[in-house]
Amino acid sequence: MARNVYGLDLGTYDIKIFDKKKDRIWHAKNVIAMKDKKYIFSVGDDAYEMYEKAPGNIQIIFPMKNGVIARFDDMQYLLGDLLKEERSFIRGAEYVIAVPTDVTEVEKKAFYDLVLHSEAKAKSVRIVERGLADGLGLGIDVPEEPGAFIANLGGGTTELSVLSYGGIVMNRLLKIGGEQLD
């Protein structure tokens, strides 16, 4: 039986999950609707439908800010709910998380802990720098590529990376993304 490996990209506005076994990408909005500041009312795409339309007693919360986890408990609830919803996720699978390169070790550990202690009951969790993950996702032979420039324009950040022979030569995480350009 082939092992189950999932790649996660937790962005400011979107969550992307790659299922290696099924060779498919699953998308969901990275948002929570909270009622009266204490009850989770809705998550994911359903919560996003309420964005800028919700009444005053419903708050729309984005658990990520500038590419990192800003509200750990909310992010953990959201990820757990999404994994329960998507029945194809197998407990005991391996997870690879793409994280921005220019973040602190504490911020990277938050991504690691988020998945390790989630509903996924992960067998293993690995962190990979987003620039390398982007290169692989684009079909670039990263270990053999003499040079590639990659720009990842996200909702809250833009990450610029120069890759060469399997490594990142230069990387910048800019705290400007689609929300500022809209």
Walk through the language-model features, giving the residues of each.
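Nucleotide/phosphate-binding catalytic cleft detector across ATP-hydrolyzing
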Residues: 1-28, 33-41, 45-151, 163-182
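A structural feature that tracks compact, well-ordered secondary-structure segments
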Residues: 159-161
